[in-house]
């Protein structure tokens, strides 16, 4: 919303959030007309907490797994671009860019705080919490390699499987 665009202090933004909703009619951005809506449908505790969060972006122009312009927290994927880079779709639906690597190489994205590695099993992202996201499956119909697993260094793992269409 407008609070995020203004770059306000996050603590102050939490205080102002309720006011902004009343004044600006959230989830609609009054300046752009963009609709942004998010829901956490369920959470399961554990070594790798499962948090199912849905997000709607009115201007996303994408046919997501939950419908047009809908994104969810496990819709993570990488897509190789012609420019020698990968687009990485984050849990919140944003995309950032990562370089194509040779086997055994690594790259650290300072802005996103992600370590990007190519090993014998495929591409692996490690976040600041130490969670590892594996992308070793086939491309889906949109050209993304979807996350196939999330694991901890202690060996706990969530595994994702997809139908042939992605």
Where do the PLM segments sit?
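Short secondary-structure "cap/edge" segments that initiate or terminate local elements
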Residues: 1-106
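Extended charged/polar low-complexity repeat regions
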Residues: 68, 84-166
């Amino acid at each position: 919303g407008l609070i995020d665009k203004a770059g306000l202090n996050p603590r102050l933004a939490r205080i102002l959030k309720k006011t902004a909703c009343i004044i600006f009619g959230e989830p609609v951005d009054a300046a752009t007309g963009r609709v942004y809506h998010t829901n956490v449908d369920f959470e399961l505790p554990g070594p790798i907490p499962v948090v199912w969060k849905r997000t709607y972006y009115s201007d996303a122009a994408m046919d997501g797994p939950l419908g047009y312009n809908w994104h969810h927290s496990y819709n993570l994927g990488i897509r190789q671009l012609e420019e020698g880079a990968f687009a990485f779709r984050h849990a919140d639906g944003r995309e950032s860019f990562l370089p194509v690597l040779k086997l055994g190489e690594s790259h650290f994205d300072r802005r996103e705080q992600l370590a990007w590695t190519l090993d014998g099993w495929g591409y692996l992202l490690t976040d600041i919490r130490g969670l590892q996201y594996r992308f070793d499956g086939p491309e889906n119909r949109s050209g993304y390699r979807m996350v196939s697993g999330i694991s901890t260094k202690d060996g706990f793992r969530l595994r994702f499987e997809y139908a042939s269409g992605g």
